[in-house]
Amino acid sequence: MFDFMTLEKVREKGPLVHNITNIVVANDSANGLLAIGASPIMASAKEEMDELAKMADVLVINIGTLDGELVTAMKIAGRAANVAGTPVVLDPVGVGATSYRRKVVQELLAEIQFAAIRGNAGELAAIAGEAWEAKGVDAGVGSADVLSIAGKVANEWSTVVIISGEVDVISDGTRFAKVANGSALLPRITGSGCLLSAVCGSFIAVQDDAFRASVEACASYAVASEYAEMELERKLPGSFRPLFLDALASWSVEKTRAKAKIQESGEHK
């Protein structure tokens, strides 16, 4: 099912990815999108959200650094994107960390139809209402079944769920996939998950099947990180970061096909 040609579509079409993101990761997210062939715009003024919704091929909302004005812009942008038929991706950074973040995410979910939600296990557990020990914006620890969490959130909100971690889990509520690739250095550079959300958005922008797009995005991203790690003399995050950007720019369909470890299944009980 997965031929990984979505990457080539991104490069051919250069989708415009509108990011309302956090101040920590904006630069890396923009550079990562440029590396894969997408066209990023980082804009958050509420006055221009309606216009941008008509221009963009996808909207990626990231709640990493929140304030009231930004939340207003997110809601305006998301509603306008829905009207325009533009897919919207949510990255609920640290949603389980504070009551304010939980409130904002619930409001966003109630007001906007999302094509995909990408987060770590702790973040998706918080949305699912499952017990999980949050650690700020990090995944933390918990005993709930990750596949069940993915399916529950996907079905409740009619979306594709991407839970990233040592093994990525992707589900649309009916189909499930695991991607068992990725460098151990990814969690050691800030914003690697946020960039993955943006990459998933760029794939969804050019592929009608958001589940397929998300699986191929996760696999391509993870395989690129493995190639970057192979180039390192010393396995340190500061050296890994620029090599990963280079790997994103030079990754190929053939490399992903050769190394991708994907396990797909039907409905999870």
Swiss-Prot record:
GO terms for biological process: thiamine biosynthetic process; thiamine diphosphate biosynthetic process. Its cofactor is Mg(2+). InterPro entries: Hyethyz_kinase, Ribokinase-like. Keywords: ATP-binding, Kinase, Magnesium, Metal-binding, Nucleotide-binding, Thiamine biosynthesis, Transferase. The keyword ATP-binding applies. Pathway: Cofactor biosynthesis; thiamine diphosphate biosynthesis; 4-methyl-5-(2-phosphoethyl)-thiazole from 5-(2-hydroxyethyl)-4-methylthiazole: step 1/1. CDD domains: THZ_kinase (cd01170). GO terms for molecular function: ATP binding; hydroxyethylthiazole kinase activity; magnesium ion binding. Its EC number is 2.7.1.50. ATP binds at R118, S164. Substrate binds at M42, G191. It catalyses: 5-(2-hydroxyethyl)-4-methylthiazole + ATP = 4-methyl-5-(2-phosphooxyethyl)-thiazole + ADP + H(+). It comes from the Bacteria. Catalyzes the phosphorylation of the hydroxyl group of 4-methyl-5-beta-hydroxyethylthiazole (THZ). HAMAP family: Thz_kinase. Belongs to the Thz kinase family. This is Hydroxyethylthiazole kinase.
